[in-house]
């Protein structure tokens, strides 16, 4: 039954309760891996309500859009107490080119993601018991069975997904209601934003992730495989 007291929790579809449980359960041994997409803006706001000094890691591949880096600065200003860490890969782009050839994101996108995303996240999670992700069930077939609390065999960790029941419209409704900053690329046809080299705009009516690795069999960077 919807009451005044339960309105906030109804609006967040269980997300606040999940986050409160996660920070109580794992205390300082949990980190939010944020890509700074629109779901990330919602989660940052919710996390800030539960734990204003929470750890947030951004996997800086060095090939993100400039708009993404600009958004991170806006988020730092909006949530100054959050501990935002920009995690770098061990290899610079020049070092990667020398080892694997130019434009690895074209010749071998799986290896590129491993070097610039998966290995850095492994390092970031090495001393953590759990991590938070903005996965939603409606995003894709590979994500439709995601639970609030998941055993992550890939990273030998617990993956907490507070937004699994949120729809795309509900995410944006929350962003607008709370005047949250968001990536300006969303306004010009980019529903899902990753690295600049592997992200294209999506036409009207297209799937929200159609612009990721367009023209390739690849649909995930590898962070969310079990």
From Swiss-Prot:
InterPro entries according to UniProt: APS_reductase, PAPS/APS_Rdtase, PAPS_reduct_dom, Rossmann-like_a/b/a_fold
Enzyme nomenclature, EC number: 1.8.4.10
Catalytic activity reported: [thioredoxin]-disulfide + sulfite + AMP + 2 H(+) = adenosine 5'-phosphosulfate + [thioredoxin]-dithiol
Main location: cytoplasm
Similarity remark: Belongs to the PAPS reductase family. CysH subfamily.
The keyword Oxidoreductase is assigned to this record: yes
Any one GO cellular component localisation term in the record: cytoplasm
Function: Catalyzes the formation of sulfite from adenosine 5'-phosphosulfate (APS) using thioredoxin as an electron donor.
GO function terms (MF aspect): 4 iron, 4 sulfur cluster binding; adenylyl-sulfate reductase (thioredoxin) activity; metal ion binding; phosphoadenylyl-sulfate reductase (thioredoxin) activity
Cofactor: record remark: Binds 1 [4Fe-4S] cluster per subunit.
Subcellular locations according to the entry: Cytoplasm
Active site: 221 (nucleophile)
Cofactor(s) recorded in Swiss-Prot or TrEMBL: [4Fe-4S] cluster
Descriptive protein name: Adenosine 5'-phosphosulfate reductase
Biological processes, Gene Ontology terms: cysteine biosynthetic process; hydrogen sulfide biosynthetic process; sulfate assimilation, phosphoadenylyl sulfate reduction by phosphoadenylyl-sulfate reductase (thioredoxin)
Positions annotated to bind [4Fe-4S] cluster: 112-113, 195, 198
Record carries keyword Cytoplasm: yes
Keywords: Cytoplasm, Iron, Iron-sulfur, Metal-binding, Oxidoreductase
Gene3D superfamilies for the chain: HUPs
Pathway(s) the chain acts in: Sulfur metabolism; hydrogen sulfide biosynthesis; sulfite from sulfate
Pfam entry (one): PAPS_reduct
């Amino acid at each position: 039954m919807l009451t005044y007291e339960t309105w906030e929790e109804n609006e967040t579809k269980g997300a606040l309760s999940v986050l409160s449980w996660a920070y109580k359960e794992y205390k300082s041994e949990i980190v939010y891996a944020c890509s700074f997409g629109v779901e990330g803006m919602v989660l940052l706001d919710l996390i800030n309500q539960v734990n204003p000094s929470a750890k947030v890691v951004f996997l800086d591949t060095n090939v993100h859009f400039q708009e993404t880096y600009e958004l991170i600065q806006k988020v730092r200003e909006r949530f100054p107490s959050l501990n935002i860490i920009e995690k770098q890969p061990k290899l610079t782009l020049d070092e990667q080119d020398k080892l694997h050839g130019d434009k690895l994101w074209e010749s071998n996108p799986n290896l590129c993601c491993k070097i610039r995303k998966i290995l850095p996240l492994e390092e970031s999670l090495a001393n953590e018991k759990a991590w938070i992700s903005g996965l939603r069930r409606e995003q894709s077939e590979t994500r439709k069975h995601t639970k609030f609390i998941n055993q992550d065999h890939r990273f030998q960790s617990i993956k907490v997904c507070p937004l699994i029941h949120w729809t795309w419209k509900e995410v944006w409704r929350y962003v607008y209601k709370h005047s949250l900053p968001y990536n300006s690329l969303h306004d010009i046809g980019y529903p899902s934003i990753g690295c600049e080299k592997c992200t294209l705009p999506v036409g009207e009516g297209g799937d929200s992730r159609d612009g990721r690795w367009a023209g390739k069999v690849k649909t995930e960077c590898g962070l969310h495989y079990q």
